[in-house]
């Protein structure tokens, strides 16, 4: 039996301008090669574009987009008797938000467009309206979980 203690969960820090944890989580996922200033520049540019295009509060659009993409259930690969099965599992709110942010950024990176700020802003607006690549990814995951419902007892 392990004598090592369990790690304490870390809370996400707040963003310096908007004082929002979601914004900080997004910045940390945009971050590549330690260039945090560039990540902030991309996100703030996207927020400014959302403000200009929709004439509404960009943080509410951001929250709405993440809430729309956040899954309740996901599939996890489990090996059982020589074959790998996709087992549906329920996921918590923090893990769901993390997945949603990852899917939003992945979908925005695949989009055609000028720069990342433009692509991210259009993906966030689309996700808030219930369409876009990230919403498609969520629906795919839900379909996979429904199809593999028979393996739910393998948890």
Curated annotation (Swiss-Prot):
Q: Which CDD domains match?
A: uS7_Chloroplast (cd14871)
PANTHER family tied to this protein: RIBOSOMAL PROTEIN S7
InterPro entries per record: Ribosomal_uS7, Ribosomal_uS7_bac/org-type, Ribosomal_uS7_CS, Ribosomal_uS7_dom, Ribosomal_uS7_dom_sf
Print the organism lineage.
Answer: Eukaryota, Viridiplantae, Streptophyta, Embryophyta, Tracheophyta
Principal location: plastid
Q: Which one GO biological process term can you cite for this protein?
A: translation
Compartments reported by the entry: Plastid, Chloroplast
Q: Does the keyword Chloroplast apply?
A: yes
Write down a Pfam family by its short name. Ribosomal_S7
Which function does this protein serve? Answer: One of the primary rRNA binding proteins, it binds directly to 16S rRNA where it nucleates assembly of the head domain of the 30S subunit.
Oligomeric and partner information: Part of the 30S ribosomal subunit.
Q: Which family does it belong to?
A: Belongs to the universal ribosomal protein uS7 family.
The alphabetized UniProt keywords are:
Chloroplast, Plastid, Ribonucleoprotein, Ribosomal protein, RNA-binding, rRNA-binding
Q: Report one GO cellular component.
A: chloroplast
Per the record, the gene is: rps7
Q: What is this protein called?
A: Small ribosomal subunit protein uS7c
One GO molecular-function annotation for this sequence?
A: structural constituent of ribosome
Record's keyword annotation contains Ribosomal protein: yes
Record-linked PROSITE patterns: RIBOSOMAL_S7
């Amino acid at each position: 039996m392990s004598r090592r203690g369990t790690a304490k969960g870390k809370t996400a820090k707040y963003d310096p301008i908007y004082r929002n944890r979601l914004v900080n989580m997004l910045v940390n996922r945009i971050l590549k090669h330690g260039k945090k200033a560039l990540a902030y520049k991309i996100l703030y540019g996207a927020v400014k574009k959302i403000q200009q295009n929709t004439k509404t509060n960009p943080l509410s659009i951001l929250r709405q987009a993440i809430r729309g993409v956040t899954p309740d259930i996901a599939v996890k690969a489990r090996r059982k008797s020589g074959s790998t099965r996709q087992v549906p599992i329920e996921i918590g709110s923090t893990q769901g938000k993390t997945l949603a942010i990852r899917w939003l950024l992945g979908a925005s990176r695949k989009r055609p467009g000028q720069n990342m700020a433009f692509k991210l802003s259009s993906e966030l607006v689309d996700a808030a309206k219930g369409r876009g690549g990230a919403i498609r990814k969520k629906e795919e995951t839900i379909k996979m979980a429904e199809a593999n419902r028979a393996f739910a007892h393998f948890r």
